[in-house]
């Protein structure tokens, strides 16, 4: 059973990130966060759970990293054996991770200085969970004589960055590249990625 203290802490985290994403980290006060949680703006209740507004943002960042790690572990447990299905599942998980953490990502892109001392931790998690893992898989495909790519690390970086581009553009400006819907974009990406991994040109 969740304790009242844990419940309040989670409510503060959720309310704060929503406010940071909507009106900006620097424009959000502790009183704003408390009021959004239904607490008295002048009560100082936030300080019972976090020493500062910055500490709250740091905790939200750690929670994001933990969620990415959990999704990585889930992918490892359920990864299909065939390339096409594995790529599809990986793509869906990357998009889900961006969607689930869209509010924190808005803060990161619009006010990077707010996350300045946390960027390395956050980016290391992103790299480990997407770029590096894709590079290892593509290197293995090349070593097995299946993929024909010359530079697995650079190629995998381009693949992951291209995949993440659509949801990030949607997140920031509510538009999509080329005005494509998400399904068409994903299916085109999957055909390209499968061609890279299998050495068979996409149709």
Say what each PLM segment does:
Residues 96-100, 107, 117-144, 153-157, ...:
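Amphipathic alpha-helical packing segments from all-alpha helical-bundle domains
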């Amino acid at each position: 059973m969740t304790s009242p203290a844990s419940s309040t802490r989670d409510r503060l985290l959720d309310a704060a990130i929503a406010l940071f994403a909507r009106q900006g980290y620097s424009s959000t006060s502790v009183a704003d966060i408390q009021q959004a949680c239904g607490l008295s703006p002048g009560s100082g209740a936030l300080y019972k759970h976090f020493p500062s507004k910055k500490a709250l943002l740091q905790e939200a960042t750690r929670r994001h990293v933990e969620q990415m790690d959990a999704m990585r572990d889930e992918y490892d447990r359920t990864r299909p054996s065939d390339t096409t299905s594995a790529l599809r599942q990986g793509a869906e998980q990357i998009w889900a991770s961006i969607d689930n953490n869209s509010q924190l990502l808005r803060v990161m892109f619009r006010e990077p200085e707010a996350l300045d001392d946390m960027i390395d931790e956050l980016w290391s998690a992103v790299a480990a969970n997407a770029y590096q893992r894709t590079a290892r898989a593509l290197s293995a495909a090349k070593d097995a004589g299946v993929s024909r790519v010359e530079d697995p690390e650079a190629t995998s970086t381009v693949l992951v960055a291209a995949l993440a581009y659509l949801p990030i553009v949607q997140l920031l400006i509510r538009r999509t590249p080329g005005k494509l819907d998400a399904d068409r974009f994903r299916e085109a990406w999957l055909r390209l990625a499968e061609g890279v991994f299998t050495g068979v040109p996409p149709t």
